[in-house]
Amino acid sequence: MKIYAVGGAIRDALLGLPVRDRDYVVVGATPEQMAAQRFRPVGKDFPVFLHPDTHEEYALARTERKTAAGYHGFQFYYAPDVTLEQDLVRRDLTINAMAREVSPDGALVGPVVDPFGGQADLRAKLFRHVGDAFVEDPVRILRVARFAARFAEFAVAPDTAALMRAMVDAGEVDALVPERVWQELARGLMEAKPSRMFAVLRECGALARILPEIDALFGVPQRADYHPEVDTGVHVMMVIDHAAKQGYSLAVRFAALTHDLGKATTPADVLPRHIGHEGRSVDLLKPLCERLRVPNECRDLALVVAREHGNLHRVMEMGAAALVRLLERADALRKPARFAEALQASEADARGRLGLETKPYPQAERLRQALVAARAVDAGAIAQGLAGEPAKIKDAVHRARVRAVAQAVGVAD
């Protein structure tokens, strides 16, 4: 029995990067032998075990064969006679199909096992598929795109790009389950350059199948005096990259991605203006979130940002009453942390424009000041003075907040 570290751990070590995850393959062993060494079985489709001390995952070497369309249609074979190279050949990219032996004390020993030229592709900064079996798993398209967001200087090898296009044309991505699509998109959004993920998906045609709402933004013009980059799709990519550069949360990055969906449906005769695109963005965003089963916290923030980002940009022109109405519509008084993230997404929107990446955004500070003042109003005390009159209580609290905001930010009621 031999144990090998495989995949990303070897790749990242060769690149001089911190190793995020460690995966192990066991060659020449049976499930019974693993159990005898106190490894705990956890795999459903094939034997995966947890180490008794470190709780890291160890998988028996296996081969796999495509039996049906989509992500789940595979038949696995595992036995002591499956070799390391047979296990590595089923992997997606050459840079992920390398291994090193692990000694009994856990140290990596011996040379890098690299049967498919992964080290050469690392040096050339190429994503290249291991073999023809790449086409059997449509998730690999999403994974290549996600890796592009992490390793932004890498390019997809031409033959790999051709295979990805063929998979899309064959309808393979249409069989992906929503949870897996969201998982890969979310992971890609959290990488350093998420725009690269969407570029790769767009180049192979997968973006139009997976996120047609985003694909439709490319080529839609905006006013050059507000958006020197002009193209709405380019703008959205700049916004998500700015959000990534600031280290914002997944919810903020998703809101940044989806805030302008409605611009794709602007009537051609009014372009490049986009009056009312905020409402159309909300109408497109709701079914998108339902289709991909987007988590509630991401969906809810994205809806606030899509609906209100135009108003957030205009707060320097607002009086206190309009500011309070905006805070109330955004539910900022009950959910100040979410509103803080809405301001981050709005600032990313303002700075995701060509030549305006460092432009000041005083709107955020004004809204923070307004929210502090509005939340300082003692609604309970006002309610006690007007017991039994709900309509009057609501109006009195609103007016008190308007007065507080007017005083705090120095604007008229």
Swiss-Prot record:
Keyword Translocase (UniProt): no
Cofactor binding description: Magnesium is required for nucleotidyltransferase activity.
Pfam families per UniProt: HD, PolyA_pol, PolyA_pol_RNAbd
Oligomeric form and interacting partners: Monomer. Can also form homodimers and oligomers.
Role this protein plays: Catalyzes the addition and repair of the essential 3'-terminal CCA sequence in tRNAs without using a nucleic acid template. Adds these three nucleotides in the order of C, C, and A to the tRNA nucleotide-73, using CTP and ATP as substrates and producing inorganic pyrophosphate. tRNA 3'-terminal CCA addition is required both for tRNA processing and repair. Also involved in tRNA surveillance by mediating tandem CCA addition to generate a CCACCA at the 3' terminus of unstable tRNAs. While stable tRNAs receive only 3'-terminal CCA, unstable tRNAs are marked with CCACCA and rapidly degraded.
Miscellaneous field: A single active site specifically recognizes both ATP and CTP and is responsible for their addition.
Protein name stated in the entry: Multifunctional CCA protein
Species for this entry: Burkholderia pseudomallei (strain K96243)
